[in-house]
Amino acid sequence: MVRCSISGASVLPSDTQVGRQLILVINLRKKIEEISIDDAVDVINNIKNTYIEKRISKYPQKDERVLDKDYVFLPLQVPDDPVSKLSKINSRELLEAAIKISKEQKVLLLIKRHPLDNSDFLSEVLDSVKDEPFVKITNGNVIDLVKNARSVIAVNSGVSLEALYLGASVWNSGTSEWWGAVNKISCLSDIQKAFEKDQPEMLSYQKNCSLFWLEIFGLGTMMLRNLCTKGG
């Protein structure tokens, strides 16, 4: 099972189940749009403040403080992550493209290795950039890494969902249950947008989608659950 870093949240374990949830979002689009944007913002802000203040995360985190500011954060996934198949751009392509753009644009890229990924390829790539001034490997706390980031890029890592609730500009190349809430990477050139200084604000529908998944994961309020049980 692929799990999000937020305590209490988990992503469904198979491609089939993810597909069902994507269909659910499509079918509930009208109801998602009916959610009060003020309510969505209030709930998300409350969670954001709680998790930033207490530095809560699903997995144990090392208390390694992040001193850098205004960087692009790339949390890596395990190569055999089943949900990563739901992307035209795999983790390797995303990593290599992000490193290239970081060096060209001289924008700091912080990469956090997944604790279960011991692949030779990743070790070689990370070893090759250890002396690059604009590429750093970090073991910092996920909450701190997201909070101080210009943007967060991933295939469809569960950290992306956490980043949405922490107010980050999130860019994904792979579909997921929260696909409607993120900025899309449809081709490698789109990755450059995540390195731009000015990041797009979340649209109302994106915020409502975020609240939708808070409800599904039991982290929000009963508001959406009540809305979905109404007639129509």
Model-found features: residue ranges?
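Short beta-alpha junction loops
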Residues: S7, R113-D117, S176-W178
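Leloir-type glycosyltransferase catalytic cores
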Residues: G8-K69, A181-G232
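Short loop/turn segments at strand-loop or loop-helix junctions that form parts
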Residues: K69-D81, R113-H114, T175
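Catalytic donor nucleotide-activated moiety binding site of glycosyltransferases and closely related
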Residues: E96-I137
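Structural motif
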Residues: Y71, L108, R150-S151
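Generic beta-sheet signal
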Residues: M1-C4, K112, V155, S173-T175
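Mid-to-C-terminal functional-domain signal that highlights helix-capping/loop sites
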Residues: S84-L94
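A donor-sugar binding/catalytic signature common to diverse glycosyltransferases
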Residues: N139-I185
